[in-house]
Amino acid sequence: MQTHDEICDLLNTDPFVAQLLAAPIPARLAYVTPDGEPRVAPVSYLWNGKAFVFASPPHFSRIAALRANPNVAFTVDTTDFPPVVMMVRGSTSIEIVQGVPEEYVEASRRIVGEDRMENWERIVREEIKEMALVTIT
């Protein structure tokens, strides 16, 4: 089994991973709800060099589920042929933060697009008062 440092080194240097991290593709996050049911949800994510990070409103059901069971898996993949696929498993930690965390803004940038980013960010900062910042290691 690889160590966390070895995994980080791979994620920070592999050209296929770099392609996926730069692509406008959400992660498909798999988790288990408190009643034991599996769920998959798309999330905009960020790799910070040591962990994957995403943010959600703290009242979303996925946050309660992750508190009850922090084990997750996710995939990021292309639809081209041949497909490029990154599959990750890990454990989450959750921090409630005031306002909109920069990680959320940066994670959303690839999906929203630079041409719409200024307006999107203004609206999000006006409407969101707190978020759950989720770190996957």
What is each model feature region?
Residues 2-28:
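Short, basic/aromatic recognition patches
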Residues 24-58, 66, 73-76, 86-88:
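Short beta-strand segments
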Residues 60-62, 81:
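Short, surface-exposed beta-strand-loop junctions and turns on beta-sheet-rich folds
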Residues 1-11, 84-137:
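Charged, gly/pro-rich active-site loop segments
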Residues 20-23, 82, 130:
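A short, polar/charged loop/turn motif at coil->beta-strand junctions and beta-hairpin connectors
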Residues 14, 59-60, 117:
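Structural motif corresponding to alpha-helix initiation and N-cap regions
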Residues 20-21, 66, 107, 136:
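A generic structural signal for nonpolar/aromatic side chains embedded in well-ordered alpha-helices
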Residues 18-19, 44, 64, 124-126:
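Short secondary-structure boundary/capping segments
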